[in-house]
């Protein structure tokens, strides 16, 4: 039985002038790496974009995507009302969540709570049951309902409940903060807005402002612990989800200031590996920042990634069990394939690896 199986996704993607992920001052997020300032897009921002893509691009069924919200009471109330219209759904929903150990009041739960559609239905079904005699057993049943049947995105990204760690789910996927492969200096766009109803003899602007932005070639990385995913979802579903995760990670993008910059791009190159030892982030390829040249940043970044991976496999890490690339420039690591073909082959490869190796 294989105890370890990981799928690593490495993406190089060039983004034009943009501000897709801002800090508290409105500036594009940055990080110091290799002694220089890099553009940065947070892990949270890209995971949110991926969860949206799961639904908007029909990569997962809606039932497979959970809700992260403080309005859990309302979700359970709605389900109770559908099951038992004659009962006081609002009162029953609050009581049910209290018994389940989820603190809530008229404003909702104290903190955001990640819950699946199946868990909502299970809580509602228990709430309308008329044969409740053992209150302790009932509360345990409510807790069990919240521990079973996670949505796909809960299985992927995990759930943390500070008030009750027994409801936590360990994430099967990790998504790194994306950083530019080169040094970046933020710039400012000074803009004016015209008042369409301004008098003709007043030529001044109706509004003045600035917006901060940068452009970058980003290195993006994510990994999926396939055995952990299989433990929650089963072998066949896990393989399908790895494919959906890969497509969402590769094609999605956070939406910050997108109407201002129209910065939606697709990757320049993708490198995917199946590993049986550990996940391997290849950001070390860019610890020495790629220098500006007439070639731009994308092509030198591909060369740096390819050379670093080859060197790493010769010294510290075993070569991947299987490798795939999309786009040009990384063919020395694996033959290039169209994206959809690569994802299909990846799904089949994961299925093959899981056959006979299911977690019991």
Feature roles, as predicted:
Residues 1-40, 44-360:
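Basic polyanion-binding and macromolecular-assembly surfaces
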